[in-house]
Curated annotation (Swiss-Prot):
InterPro entries: ArgE/DapE_CS, Bact_exopeptidase_dim_dom, Peptidase_M20, Peptidase_M20_dimer, Peptidase_M20B. Optimum pH is around 8. The enzyme is stable in a pH range of 9-10. The active site is at residues 83, 178. Cleaves the N-terminal amino acid of tripeptides. This is Peptidase T. Zn(2+) 1 binds at residues 81, 143, 201. NCBIfam families: peptidase-T, PRK05469.1, PRK13381.1.
Length: 413
């Protein structure tokens, strides 16, 4: 194996349950994330990182790989998140399959679940590689403990294995709660103190992402007027029916299951209630700022029209922006995309530059003034029992980081 400790690190990290909790009011959202961040801090110190510190304000643990060059080069930041998605993460039992043939069905532990190339054709890309997958009872946690392990392996390489590898100052940060959308809300750009950064939180080999959705959340409250159904004519106002009418007024084809590429959508996450009162929760997504604003305006317009027809204010939307398309920031200086693209090409990796149909911590951090695109970490089928990662892809992620650092040495501030 190219990086001897990469896989052991990854296996150690995924066995720790760091599932974030969207119902929590604390930062980080769980005590387990606090404890894991402190554990990572100790590991960072053991590798030789300097100025390792935990920020109570945001749950990030930060450390520095000091420069070993006199060149005045840009300071690079590397970020990954410690939490995992909303799926069982207790008792993660990673399975290792060496020299996968690219065709066989992979049994997931003792469960009835399998990774079948007929269902997951991406498996065919991994012939001859070593895969780490689940036992079918949990997620794997490659999102984003692959990124955590890769950054730690990079640090080990620069500080201990090949300390003569020339580099400027590199800052490392591991944070909480990316999966519940609040991890970067309190990120401290001044404390991180770099010129640009990357999140190592992408998927398959070659992913290089700097364009995300712009995102908003909407909660629609529906106030009904409930009476006995036997005498309801011209009197009852059924809040659930109002919710149905509202949803049906949205564009039929602007839904996640009917869109792709750069197409945006409205997504109904939750609907509950009674004839007296109901509540619908939506997310709104689009890559283009104009269309994003039009979608938010439409949700208000539908409510206004329904209220006008009812003659009463019974439909009450609350719409809040969540994050924005970081391309608006990064396109002002594409050099950090160019250097990552060049690094991959130098390693015979084909860059995959496509808009993310989602967001990353980098979306928010970029709008705080620190451009932060996203690099591949290797995970496939993330957020569930069918998740897997290739060890060889993880190794190439470390290679890519090293090549970015090498190329950065040629850019004098």
């Amino acid at each position: 194996m190219k990086y001897e400790k990469l896989l052991p690190r990854f296996l150690e990290y995924v066995k720790v349950n760091t599932r974030s909790d969207e119902n929590s009011t604390t930062t980080p959202s769980t005590q387990a994330l606090v404890e894991f961040a402190h554990k990572m801090g100790e590991d960072m110190k053991a590798l030789g990182l300097k100025d390792v510190h935990y920020l109570e304000s945001n749950g990030y643990v930060i450390g520095t790989i000091p420069a070993n060059t006199d060149k005045k080069v840009r300071k690079i930041g590397l970020l990954a998140h410690l939490d995992t998605a909303d799926f069982n993460a207790e008792g993660v039992n990673p399975q290792i399959l060496e020299n996968y043939d690219g065709e066989s069905v992979i049994k997931l532990g003792d469960t009835e679940f399998t990774l079948d190339p007929k269902d997951f054709p991406n498996l065919k890309n991994y012939k001859g590689q070593t895969l780490v997958h689940t036992d079918g009872t949990t997620l794997l946690g490659s999102d984003d403990k692959s990124g955590v392990a890769e950054i730690m392996t990079l640090a080990d390489y620069l500080l201990n294995i090949n300390p003569d590898f020339e580099h400027g100052e590199i800052r490392v940060g591991f944070g909480p709660d990316e999966e519940i959308g609040v991890g970067a809300d309190k990120f401290d750009v001044a404390d991180f103190d770099v010129d640009f950064a990357y999140t190592v939180d992408g998927g398959p080999l070659g992913e290089l992402q700097y364009e995300t959705f712009s995102a908003a959340g909407a909660v629609i409250e529906f106030q009904g007027k409930n009476v006995h159904p036997g005498t309801a004519k011209n009197t009852m106002v059924n809040a659930l029916q109002l919710a149905i009418d509202y949803h049906n007024a949205l564009p039929e084809f602007d839904r996640p299951e009917k869109t792709e590429g750069r197409e945006g959508f409205f997504h109904l996450l939750k609907l509950d209630g009674t004839p007296e009162e109901a509540r619908a929760q939506y997310i709104i997504r689009d890559h283009e700022e104009g269309k994003f604003n039009e979608r938010k305006a439409l949700m208000q317009e539908i409510a206004d029209k329904m209220n006008a027809e009812l003659g009463q204010n019974r439909v009450k939307p609350v719409i809040k922006d969540q994050y924005y398309n970081m391309a608006q920031i990064i396109e002002k200086d594409m050099s950090i995309i160019d250097i990552a693209k060049k690094a991959m090409e130098n390693l015979d990796i084909v860059p995959i530059i496509e808009p993310i149909r989602g967001g990353t911590d980098g979306s928010k951090i970029s709008f705080m003034g620190l451009p932060t695109p996203n690099l591949f970490a290797g995970g496939e089928n993330m957020h569930g029992r069918f998740e897997f990662v290739s060890v060889q892809t993880m190794e190439k992620a470390v290679d890519t980081l090293l090549e970015i650092i090498r190329l950065n040495n040629e850019v004098v501030k």
